Amino acid sequence: MWQGCAVERPVGRMTSQTPLPQSPRPRRPTMSTVVELNVGGEFHTTTLGTLRKFPGSKLAEMFSSLAKASTDAEGRFFIDRPSTYFRPILDYLRTGQVPTQHIPEVYREAQFYEIKPLVKLLEDMPQIFGEQVSRKQFLLQVPGYSENLELMVRLARAEAITARKSSVLVCLVETEEQDAYYSEVLCFLQDKKMFKSVVKFGPWKAVLDNSDLMHCLEMDIKAQGYKVFSKFYLTYPTKRNEFHFNIYSFTFTWW
């Protein structure tokens, strides 16, 4: 009797219905995210919330996107800036603590990082008010102050090629009427063989104290690292005695 053979049906591959595990998406940094900073070689630890405390500041802009921030070899966020006065900046961002020491230096850092509330607070302090408000307003009344200051230094350097000291004269021309006689002053200095490099300041419309202007000039030149002292040189009356010109001498010592 014939017996049929059993036919085995092909078995299809088993497919797993269990979904494959997915790698977790990176979390977006939150305001409480702790970050490590390398500020000019000095390390600080803070949070994004602290750095972003004042929208519009340079720090808030730097850390608005961590992908854009520079990092050092250890992964710290790097700020290429001297770190000496960064801690007072960070303390203010953390707690609102206003610095009480090194005010001018911290003020410059606050300006650099564009932290406007801190800048305003520091400008109300005597150390900054006198320099940035009172003195600055005074000098704004002197036309061409910065340019003439630079000219004084250039002339003094030019005369110091073979000399230990060099001098520059400063002539104050207070009014436009007085300015018309300025050439007479130059002729007088030349005739008396006192003619040196002369820089004219003025005319101006405000009422200024000459001694205050001389003090500002000497202070600003010294701030550039030069050794200089000023003194009254002479008063020149015009031939008709209508005006008097005050002339001052600035002496630079080079070695």
UniProtKB/Swiss-Prot annotation:
It holds the Pfam family BTB_2. GO terms for biological process: protein homooligomerization. Residues 1-29 are annotated as: Disordered. Residues 33-130 form the BTB domain. It comes from the Eukaryota. This is BTB/POZ domain-containing protein KCTD14. The gene is KCTD14.
